[in-house]
Design a protein with these regions (language model features):
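Membrane-helix boundary elements
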Residues: 20-23, 69-83, 135-137, 156-171, ...
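Transmembrane alpha-helical segments of integral membrane proteins
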Residues: 215-230
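Hydrophobic alpha-helical transmembrane segments in multi-pass integral membrane proteins
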Residues: 79-86, 133-145, 183-198, 248-262
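N-terminal topogenic module of multi-pass integral membrane proteins
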Residues: 1-110, 230-270
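Membrane-proximal helix-loop-helix units in multi-pass membrane proteins
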Residues: 90-103, 107-184, 188
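Hydrophobic faces of alpha-helical transmembrane segments in multi-pass integral membrane proteins
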Residues: 21, 25, 70, 74, ...
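Hydrophobic, aromatic-rich alpha-helical transmembrane segments
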Residues: 8-19, 61, 65-69, 118, ...
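Short alpha-helical packing/oligomerization segments
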Residues: 192-215
């Protein structure tokens, strides 16, 4: 009994230390971006926080990197959003960066540690949303080829994350198919870049493609569940999300869109 109590105390202490270190990372990233807008230092901090990925023999790096693509996507995406908030020209820059930092803290402490199947879907969806937001915002800074490649990696990582949690034997093939679909969205993002925002937030806008990418991910996951579980599409848990996401995409593309090159070239300001 005494051993169990000691072990429990150690586990609690370890959990508290893990939370404290994650919150320290959030504070350091926020400070670096708010004070000096040094995105490269913030990215280095994100990489250093993933030291365990590389703390093995080099031949295991590929597996570890693929297994952590979702976490890398969110981390790099948060840095991009902090940078976007800093250059938004809004009088609420501080609060925008605080909001992004609070989200990052929730990701590290609450969302990321979960291991259930539903949690893996939430994690993958978060990566798709944050990653596509960042890529849409900076697509014309990094170029068309880089945008497509990053979309490809983001799609593979998100799909792999869900499929591995579901113990699918063909996860690599299926993840590659989804990655190709997202690569196409990456190409579209470069040429069709529209943002929605509030006038008081300045250039800090929500890209249309972030919403569309998330909807595509939800549709793909629900259709995958239909095939795997041999369920009928008429079941509400399958049909409702698919129909809702399809309607959202159609409304955005047909009624709230206009095309043109550039960073949020046709901005919808509320």
């Amino acid at each position: 009994m005494e051993f169990l109590q000691t072990s429990r105390r150690r586990n609690i202490f370890g959990d508290l230390m893990h939370i404290a270190l994650n919150l320290a990372l959030v504070c350091m990233v926020f400070a670096v971006m708010y004070v000096g807008q040094r995105a490269e230092i913030a990215l280095i901090l994100i990489m250093l926080s993933k030291w365990r990925v590389f703390a093995v023999r080099w031949r295991y790096w590929r597996v570890n990197i693929l297994a952590n693509l979702v976490d890398f996507t969110v981390g790099f995406g948060v840095v991009a959003l902090l940078y976007l908030a800093a250059g938004s020209g809004s009088s609420h820059t501080l609060w925008l960066q605080v909001g992004v930092s609070i989200f990052f803290a929730l990701w590290l402490v609450v969302i990321k540690p979960r291991t259930r199947a539903l949690a893996s879907k939430v994690q993958a969806g978060t990566a798709l949303f944050i990653g596509s937001w960042a890529l849409a915002a900076f697509s014309h800074d990094i170029g068309q080829i880089a945008t497509v490649i990053f979309y490809l990696g983001m799609g593979y990582g998100a799909a792999r994350h869900v499929l591995v949690a579901a113990d699918d034997k063909h996860y690599s093939l299926l993840a590659s198919v989804f990655a190709l679909v997202l690569a196409e969205l990456g190409w579209v993002t470069y040429h069709w870049n529209i943002g929605y925002g509030l006038s008081l937030l300045g250039g800090f806008m929500l890209p249309q493609m972030a919403i569309i990418t998330l909807c595509v991910g939800v549709i793909a996951e629900r259709l995958y569940q239909t095939i795997i579980a041999k369920a009928s599409f008429s079941q509400p848990r399958i049909s409702v999300p698919v129909i809702a996401c399809t309607v959202v995409v159609l409304v955005l593309v047909l009624f709230v869109s206009s095309t043109g090159p550039g960073l949020y070239p046709n901005q919808t300001i509320i």
